[in-house]
C-alpha cells in the first residue's frame, strides 16, 4: 500500500496552491489502488511551535523523558511517523515574503530531529529519511522560477536544502506563478500547473 502525505499551508480561502496539491495527491492515489492520503492542513490546524521543554526533551533518550516531556514531543513523534510512512509527499505553499508560510516551517521544525530524521557523523550529517518523492506546489503573484526575481525565491532552495538534509533529494516544484499579472496570465499559469499534475499522475 502506498502512502501519500499531503501538507497544505496556505491560510487563504482562495488559495490556488492548496487545491492543485490536493488534486495531485488524489490523482496519485487513484493511480495506485489501495493507496491512502494522509492530510495535514497546517493552516487550519496549526502545529505547536517548539519551545524550551521540547528542545530539552528531544535531547534525551525516550525512556529518560518525564511525562511532561513525553507530552511535549507527542505531536512531533506523530509527524515523524507520518513522514517515514509516506512514499510520496505533496507540499503546497504560497511564496510569502520570498519564503514559505510559517505553518510549514513549524512542521519542518517538528520533524527535523537529530538522531531521528538525520544524524551527525564524523564525516558529516546523514539524512535518515530516504526513498521519498516530493512535489512542491508553489504559488506566487510574480514570476520567481526564472528571470530577475528568481534570486528572491528562497522557498525552493530552502525546501531542497532542509529536505535534502533529512535525506530527501527527489524533489519537483510545480510553479503557479504570475498570478498578479491579470486574469489571462493567471489562467495560463493555473492551466500549466494542472497540465503538469495530469502528466505526473499518468506517469505514476
From Swiss-Prot:
It comes from the Bacteria. The keyword NAD applies. It holds the Pfam family Flavodoxin_2. One of its GO terms (molecular function) is oxidoreductase activity, acting on NAD(P)H as acceptor. Keywords: Flavoprotein, FMN, NAD, Oxidoreductase. The keyword Oxidoreductase applies. Its cofactor is FMN. It catalyses: 2 a quinone + NADH + H(+) = 2 a 1,4-benzosemiquinone + NAD(+); N,N-dimethyl-1,4-phenylenediamine + anthranilate + 2 NAD(+) = 2-(4-dimethylaminophenyl)diazenylbenzoate + 2 NADH + 2 H(+). Belongs to the azoreductase type 1 family. Quinone reductase that provides resistance to thiol-specific stress caused by electrophilic quinones. Also exhibits azoreductase activity. Catalyzes the reductive cleavage of the azo bond in aromatic azo compounds to the corresponding amines. Homodimer. This is FMN-dependent NADH:quinone oxidoreductase 1. It comes from Rhizobium etli (strain ATCC 51251 / DSM 11541 / JCM 21823 / NBRC 15573 / CFN 42). The gene is azoR1.
